[in-house]
């Protein structure tokens, strides 16, 4: 394959992986450990 094709596929794969990890962190199992500063601030 050409170098440009490999670079494009690699960057696309990294972007998809990062997006998947971010969604898992935000909505998956680790989201239980995230703190909510608005909920902590009692008015």
Curated annotation (Swiss-Prot):
InterPro entries, per the entry: PSII_PsbN
This protein's encoding gene: psbN
GO biological process, any: photosynthesis
Protein's job: May play a role in photosystem I and II biogenesis.
Residues that span the membrane, as ranges: 5-27
Subcellular location, principal: plastid
One Pfam family recorded for the sequence: PsbN
The organism's place on the tree of life at top rank: Eukaryota
Assigned protein family: Belongs to the PsbN family.
This protein's record includes keyword Thylakoid: yes
A GO CC term attached to the entry: chloroplast thylakoid membrane
Name by which UniProt lists this protein: Protein PsbN
Membrane topology: Single-pass membrane protein
